Amino acid sequence: HAKYFKLYHYAKGITLLEVDMTTDTARKPETVDSGKENAKTEAADSQELTGTEKLYMGNVVKYLIVPEGAVIPAGLDKDVIVINQPVESAYVASTDALNILDKLDLTDKVTALGMEKEDCTVDSLTAALEDGSVTFAGKDEDTDYKALVKSQCGISILSSDILPTEEADTEAKENLLKDSAEKYSTLKIPFCR
C-alpha cells in the first residue's frame, strides 16, 4: 500500500498515476466545506493559471503514462498530465529519485541535473557532469529552463522540497510551485515530485 500515490493500469499499457500532494506537507486537503468557502478566491487564482498549470496545483496530480503508439481519447489531456513513453531525456533535481533511477539502471536517460557534481550521489552522473554529457540546469527557483530546452528534456523530476512542510512556508512554496507549473507547462515538460 503506497502512501503518496495510486496506480491504475488500463488496456494497451496505459497507466494512470495519481500523486497526493498533501501527505506529509503543510498543504491542506480540500473538503467540501472549505471548497465552498474558498471558491471565489480559488476562482480568481485559477484564472491566472491556464490548462496544465491548474492540474499541478490540485491536491492530487494525475499523470497518464502512455506507451509509444498508444492513442488516448480526445480531450483526456485536459484532465491529466500526459507523459509519453519512451522518455529519452530527463532533468532530475531530487537525490532520492536519482538514487532510485540508479538502482533501476536508468541514469542513462538523465541529461540534466538539479544538483552540482559535489552533491551528486551517482558516480556515473558525477563523471558525466565533469565531461559535459550531462548539464547542471540549476535547482528549484534557479532552474535554467533554456538548458532544459537545449537538452531536449522530456520530463522533470523535482524534489519534494518544492512543497511546503510547515505552515509558515505555505505561501512561498505555493508561489514557487505555481511558478514552476507555469514555466514547465509553457515548455510542455511534465514534472513531478
Question: Where are the model-predicted features located?
Answer:
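Charged, glycine-enriched surface loops/patches
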Residues: 167-193
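A short, structured surface patch at a secondary-structure boundary
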Residues: 13-15, 24, 50-172, 182
